[in-house]
């Protein structure tokens, strides 16, 4: 595995460090809709581009969740972050679960926004064909976007999301990532993890629904929480940014509250 410092931007200067990982269809710009309203005094966010995306579009690699997790941990090392929380959207949810498995003692809290389970996401043959061909077929990407947001989003938004996806991802990497996040099962490596874990699901997302999270995320993490956002599909950063921020930051902030309680008990 070649060494790579993931391209990233830092936002905020708070004491609670957070690394946020994008999904299959976008680079770190996926988080642009929430940036203006984050609590940058309490948190410092590192938004990254995985290999094959954004500023790392031309980077070589195997384009697997394990490689992505190793890159995330290497970035934390480079930033000097011994302890940090993780956020991952969709495919990025699988990457951050891999990172938790690789460095469990370093992760404060983990958040999956419509996360792919650590068991992968087996697809029926027709859906697999739709997803696999999306690497070179913009119409397939648009169909996936439309289906996973309940068929309720305007054409202009769908078209813009497709353009962004095409511009900011390498087709070969895009296709290779699918094999990893959909086909690999590593849930035995995170099953029983004591790390507090939040899953955020969209009520309009038929693929990575609250029901699926109950059967996976909620079973594997003893300290799991699940929040379902109404009138929201797979892309909560675009569809419900303020609700997402409040949900995620309240969860992350509870880590400091828990530490305060522990300090009080020791006193």
Range-by-range predicted roles:
Residues 223-267:
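Catalytic active-site module of serine/aspartate enzymes centered on a nucleophile-bearing elbow/loop
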């Amino acid at each position: 595995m070649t060494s790579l410092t993931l391209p990233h931007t830092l936002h905020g200067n708070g004491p609670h460090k957070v690394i946020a990982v994008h999904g299959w269809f976008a680079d770190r710009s996926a988080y642009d809709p929430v940036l203006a309203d984050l609590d940058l005094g309490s948190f410092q966010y590192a938004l990254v581009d995985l290999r094959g995306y954004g500023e790392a579009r031309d980077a070589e690699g195997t384009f697997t969740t394990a490689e992505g997790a190793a890159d995330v941990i290497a970035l934390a090392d480079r930033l000097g972050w011994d302890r940090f929380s993780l956020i991952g959207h969709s495919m990025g949810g699988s990457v951050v679960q891999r990172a938790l498995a690789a460095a469990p003692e370093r992760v404060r809290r983990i958040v999956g926004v419509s996360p792919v389970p650590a068991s992968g996401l087996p697809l029926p043959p027709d859906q697999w064909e739709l997803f696999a061909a999306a690497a070179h077929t913009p119409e397939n990407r648009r169909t996936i976007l439309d289906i996973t947001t309940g068929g309720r989003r305007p054409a202009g938004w769908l078209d813009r999301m497709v353009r962004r996806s095409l511009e900011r991802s390498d087709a070969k990497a895009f296709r290779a990532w699918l094999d990893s996040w959909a086909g690999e099962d590593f849930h035995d490596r995170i099953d029983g993890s004591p790390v507090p874990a939040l899953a955020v699901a969209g009520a309009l997302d038929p693929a990575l629904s609250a029901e699926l999270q109950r059967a996976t995320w909620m079973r594997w993490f003893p300290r799991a929480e699940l929040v379902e956002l109404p009138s929201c599909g797979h892309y909560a950063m675009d569809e419900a940014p303020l609700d997402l921020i409040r949900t995620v930051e309240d969860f992350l902030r509870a880590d400091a509250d828990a530490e305060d309680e522990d300090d009080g008990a020791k006193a």
